[in-house]
Amino acid sequence: MPTVHNSEYIKELLVDNTSYKIYDINKAASDIGISLNKLPYSLRVLLENVLRTSGNKENLLVFKEWLKTKKSNTEIDFMPARVLMQDFTGVPAIVDLAAMRDAMQKIGCNPLKINPLIPVDLVIDHSVSVDSYGLKESFEQNVQMEMKRNIERYQFLKWGQQAFNNFKVVPPGTGICHQVNLEYLSKVVWYNDGTAYPDSLVGTDSHTTMVNGLSVLGWGVGGIEAEAAMLGQPLTMIIPEVIGVKLTGKLEGMATATDLVLTITEMLRRTKVVGKFVEFFGYGLSNLTISDRATISNMSPEYGATCGFFPIDQETIKYLEITGRETRQIKLVEKYATEQNLWYNFEDTQEYTEVLELDLSTVYSSLAGPKRPQDRVNLSFVESNFKNELPYFALENQDIDKKYAVANQNYEIGNGDVVIAAITSCTNTSNPSVMIGAALLAKKALEHGLNVKPWVKTSLAPGSKVVTEYLKISGLDKYLDALGFNLVGYGCTTCIGNSGSLNPEIENTINKNRLVVASVLSGNRNFEGRINPLTKASYLASPILVVAYALSGTLNIDLTTTPIGANIYLKDIWPSQKEIDAVIANSINPSMFIEKYADVFNGTKEWHDLHITTGTNYNWDKNSTYINNPPYFDNICSENTIKDIKSAKILAIFGDSITTDHISPAGSISKNSPAAKYLIEHNIEPLNFNSYGSRRGNHEVMMRGTFANIRIKNEMCNGVEGGFTINQLSGVQQTIYDAAMDYQAHDIPLVVFAGKEYGSGSSRDWAAKGPGLLGIKAIIAESFERIHRSNLVGMGILPLTFTGNNTRLSLKLDGSETIDIIGLSKNIRPFNLVKCVIKKQTNEISTIDLILQIFTENEINYIKHGSIMQFVVESLKG
């Protein structure tokens, strides 16, 4: 039985003759001398969590402190109700748990102590690629290819399901984890052992935040933090600043929820909300469905916030009803939220660190690109935006308007042509309004004699089977099929870079003529090199605009003033909101959700037929190139101290906005990369390389793939793209991996310098694990993104920031310097100042201050133990 804390706050909640115990946050707030109505709704959820899980009532006083200054420097322990994972991040997490069991056995402890104590759901959604498209058979063909490529990984996950308690796997071909979470897994109010409490979670994908649109507090963490949470370790955090966004008015004209989230992303990136909660309030909430809100919450990582929270209201109840949740559960949510002052009240006087305001009627039809999700562009300016960005792509001495013939085809392509148009990602496919809007636009386009341009690769990959069901019931699926937007899979596909190959003749034309072609997708990220290696420009857009750009085939058009064809303008085929709402009313009902999720954990015959080994500990195959026992626990009993870094060399110097995609790419493995060399040495043909993301269970592949993004630029190698550096031992340009191994052989520690927003993007912990295995001891940057900073600490790597006006540029670093970081071996505390001594080859020495970006005492312990994983094993072995 779990330990009961603060029992004097337990009271009974009666819902239809069922009695639940709840922790009364109204009484708790009164006892510490605050008005609960002044606390943001997201912090009320945190207050309940601390009240229910903390043994020290004094911990509640931090909320009183927060109300005084609207910020806090005091840490709390957060205990999520559950954990959500996807397979790219989930496989390495289960590998780590399996390795922990071996480590426990090695030191004479019970390996079964390594077991999730809270529910863990893993949804396999990241592995399907768009190999086949434009055919009615595409879905089946892609599923077969997925199973063939990933059989070893899936066998491992099935082993994990039988080996670990509280661990369930949603098989491939079912949906995207965040949409499955929204439509099925989330309860809004959880109950266990007779106690009801707010649903909450952390997930190993940064877009876990999507569920905040359903009033479930949650955010993305690295796999190593998620592992700790599974094993009962609290997630230590400082109560964040909360930015209130007051919404007024309603969307008008052609504006969609996608346009709204791109507008919010642009606005909040400028406001700088990294590490902060964002909470939406105001009368505008009544004009946003849960699907609209989920779209906004999904892109929290893109605007930098820990989460984008919407409080419970009548829309929450309507969504639970339409998605087929049990009546008992819905009544519990309504009664609990009302009793605990978690139900949104327009008259509440909640206070925020800062308040921003957005009138929904000012939102215009938009895209974002060509390489960052915060770079919103009005639809009417996309053509000029793309042309203005062309110089960035280094098109010197080229006729940018020239068209080039495609072999064996009767068309030409040029710069700005759209070669990928993908309706993809849970960000938008979870929203019936934009999905039905896209289908209606397809219908009208066909009725006006329009068609998709032949050079455009089209695909439809929704986040759940419910989407294809309502498209089928509405009769609109046939119009999308007719334009080539056939179902290719239920998974992330193009949004995460699994866009598949283009037509070989098109690829040859692009490469031969160095064309800057584009992808337009309904996803949430468009970082360089992410969507497809050949689409240097990528624009995020609503599914409706994805179809529109597939029809135009180019960015070199103003769709607001120029006809798409034969005097047909976009406005002529754009569906009205009234048309969309009518289809929704006639095509979506609770029974389809109940039916499609009835067998969500069952899977296909191919899944059932997977042969697996059983047992407590995993039987590692030393020859496997997918699953390998990692070396994190080789020195499990080593001395737990922090030492100064002496005589370190600089492995790389990076600019601003280095993403986790740059650090640890998820996409295809280049044939000339260190990872490819390793795979070839292990008799893997290039055709079977699969992706970096699929091989995250093998540290040998992943450390070789660290900083291997084809678009990354190390400032030590002027003008060179890709994962290269100058090895200071030889003076030779090498791959970053090869240079790092040379430094390791000489026992030389490494550091990396960078600019602003280092580690933005996905939550992938391999962006910290990889650098750790390369021997990097510290990253020195102007600023870090939230999740990546936590991941670095979790792997024992020091995140350090400059003080004053110092930057890598002001210091005039060229990479030949030797670095000492002094002051670590003393009694270090969070946010300590440490000294960085920079020794140039000219013997010139300078010393600067750096700020240790370690937030809590727990994080100090992770650094001392070498990683959060070693800390957990040490904690459990007693």
Curated annotation (Swiss-Prot):
Gene3D superfamilies in the cross-refs: 6.10.190.10, Aconitase, domain 3 (3.30.499.10), Aconitase, domain 4 (3.20.19.10)
Record-linked Pfam families: Aconitase, Aconitase_C
Cofactor note (record): Binds 1 [4Fe-4S] cluster per subunit.
Keywords from the UniProt entry: 4Fe-4S, Iron, Iron-sulfur, Lyase, Metal-binding, RNA-binding, Tricarboxylic acid cycle
Positions of [4Fe-4S] cluster binding: 426, 492, 495
Any single GO BP term: propionate metabolic process, methylcitrate cycle
Cofactor(s) it depends on: [4Fe-4S] cluster
Catalytic activity: citrate = D-threo-isocitrate; (2S,3R)-3-hydroxybutane-1,2,3-tricarboxylate = 2-methyl-cis-aconitate + H2O
Keyword Lyase: yes
Record pathway: Carbohydrate metabolism; tricarboxylic acid cycle; isocitrate from oxaloacetate: step 2/2; Organic acid metabolism; propanoate degradation
Enzyme class: lyase
GO molecular-function terms, A-Z: 2-methylisocitrate dehydratase activity; 4 iron, 4 sulfur cluster binding; aconitate hydratase activity; metal ion binding; mRNA 3'-UTR binding; mRNA binding
EC number: 4.2.1.3, 4.2.1.99
Assembly information from the UniProt record: Monomer.
Family recorded in the similarity comment: Belongs to the aconitase/IPM isomerase family.
Function: Involved in the catabolism of short chain fatty acids (SCFA) via the tricarboxylic acid (TCA)(acetyl degradation route) and probably the 2-methylcitrate cycle I (propionate degradation route). Catalyzes the reversible isomerization of citrate to isocitrate via cis-aconitate. Could catalyze the hydration of 2-methyl-cis-aconitate to yield (2R,3S)-2-methylisocitrate. The apo form of AcnA functions as a RNA-binding regulatory protein.
UniProt name for this protein: Aconitate hydratase A
Organism: Rickettsia typhi (strain ATCC VR-144 / Wilmington)
